UniProtKB/Swiss-Prot annotation:
Annotated Basic and acidic residues bias: 235-248
A Pfam family this chain is assigned to: PCI
Biased composition (Polar residues): 223-232
Domain PCI as annotated: residue spans: 2-159
InterPro entries the UniProt entry points to: COPS7/eIF3m, CSN7_helixI, PCI_dom
Protein name: COP9 signalosome complex subunit 7b
Any single GO CC term annotated in Swiss-Prot or TrEMBL for this entry: cytosol
Disordered: annotated span: 223-264
Keywords, comma-separated and alphabetical: Acetylation, Coiled coil, Cytoplasm, Host-virus interaction, Nucleus, Phosphoprotein, Signalosome
Gene Ontology process terms (BP): COP9 signalosome assembly; protein deneddylation; regulation of protein neddylation
């Protein structure tokens, strides 16, 4: 339905409202809850709160670093900085691994199991596939497992939080995408133009052929009519001489009759 919000969105809003009025250890406990909460995979709004940013100056700076890592980082980033960060619970660890899959999916549409096993520091294929299935059920990715070729084929993934410093790169990418679209559009327009020209030439040729066929039909019809008239004329000429010969004896007979009458 239009305007319907997912429970995770409402849950994040509740955490943000709670965070606005807390500080110190209460705020770090709230951050830990957010990082464990099912369905919450974006943290930018929470990071923007002034009291959350103030954690950078105190003894709880590690929690701000951890929140930043969940917003922008991956599981390998956590492993690389593990000594200076709070220990993750099982739920937090799985969520960060889910977010790592999302980051990989944004760059690759077919992710080899070998890459996933390495980045997620997993050795068991069954556990890896279970983790991927969990990510699919949380709607952060859509795809299918190709067990034969050991690939995760990605159809869709959610967007992660964006750093301000990354905005210029995003704008650049969008400009390049627009330029690519314009190039494709120009190519399509040229193909349409060539197709229209081909169609016009084809229609013109077809009209010429039809006109020639019509002329040939007229010529054949006229020739056939002329031949028929000639044949009729020849037949008529052949029939005329016998009639003339029959008339001449009649005249001679009348002359003979006249001579006979005069003698009498």
């Amino acid at each position: 339905m239009a305007g319907e919000q997912k429970p995770s969105s409402n849950l994040l809003e509740q955490f943000i409202l709670l965070a606005k009025g807390t500080s110190g250890s209460a705020l770090t406990a709230l951050i830990s809850q957010v990082l464990e909460a099912p369905g919450v995979y974006v943290f930018g709004e929470l990071l923007e709160l002034a009291n959350v940013q103030e954690l950078a100056e105190g003894a709880n700076a590690a929690y701000l670093q951890l929140l930043n890592l969940f917003a922008y980082g991956t599981y390998p980033d956590y492993i690389a900085n593990k000594e200076s960060l709070p220990e993750l619970s099982t739920a937090q660890q799985n969520k960060l691994k889910h977010l790592t899959i999302v980051s990989l999916a944004s760059r690759m549409k077919c992710i080899p199991y070998s890459v996933l096993l390495k980045d997620l520091e997993m050795r068991n294929l069954r556990e890896l596939e279970d983790l991927i299935i969990e990510a699919v059920y949380t709607d952060i990715i859509q795809g299918k497992l190709d067990q034969r070729n050991q690939l995760l084929e990605v159809d869709f993934c959610i967007g992660r939080d964006i750093r301000k410093k990354d905005i210029n790169n995003i704008v650049k990418t969008l400009h390049e995408w627009c330029d690519g679209c314009e190039a494709v559009l120009l190519g399509i327009e040229q193909q349409v133009l060539r197709a229209n020209q081909y169609k016009e030439n084809h229609n013109r040729t077809q009209q010429q052929v039809e006109a020639e066929v019509t002329n040939i039909k007229k010529t054949l019809k006229a020739t056939a009519s002329s031949s028929a008239q000639e044949m009729e004329q020849q037949l008529a000429e052949r029939e005329c001489p016998p009639h003339a010969e029959q008339r001449q004896p009649t005249k001679k007979m009348s002359k003979v009759k006249g001579l006979v009458s005069s003698r009498h």
